[in-house]
Amino acid sequence: MSAALWALSTPLHAQTRGAWTAGFAGTLGGGWQIEAADIGYVRALRAGPVRVASLTARLGSFVDEGAILGGARGFIFGLTLGGHTGLLSLADLGTETSKSQVGVDLTVEGTAYVGTRSPFPEGSPWGAVTVLPGLKFGDPDGVQFGLLLGPTFFFGQASDVRPFLGVRFEAPLARRESHP
């Protein structure tokens, strides 16, 4: 809550470098998987190949993909710190005044999880490192949509590797109007 108040109380110029992010995060496959919602804050950063840093909260549950009814069990909470490379543009769509960009980037995330009634052998708490190549679409200075898919490495009392799917929306905190 304090972080949200801090972000909203910053001057307009500082807010142009930040954005809100929301989306879906889940592991893929049969058996027990994680399905969660993400909400967080991203900020432009210039640190070598890392162009964007993100801090995200993840809230969800364990879901048995083999169950037809009643497959949810327990809850998870995760705190994720991520670094994103710059967008490698593949195509520009639209006009000069209303353009959209399609591109790829790479995201590396570290997540600390706690959970209740975990069916995973990692126990609770546990950690994860995720490497996510992603496809992004949208206004470079506005709302963007991203689809990320890659491996996540769980570690705790045991280790495991699972496929990870992320669907993300980003919206800037403030937008400067273009001047003629």
Question: Where do the language-model regions lie?
Answer:
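Short glycine/proline- and aromatic-enriched beta-strand/turn motifs that initiate or cap beta-hairpins
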Residues: 8-69, 168-180
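Intrinsically disordered, low-complexity regulatory regions of eukaryotic regulatory proteins
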Residues: 33-36, 103, 107, 158, ...
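Gram-negative (and chloroplast) outer-membrane scaffold detector with strong preference
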Residues: 38-126, 132
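Outer-membrane beta-barrel domain signature
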Residues: 13, 25-32, 66-72, 117-123, ...
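Bacterial N-terminal signal peptides
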Residues: 1-9
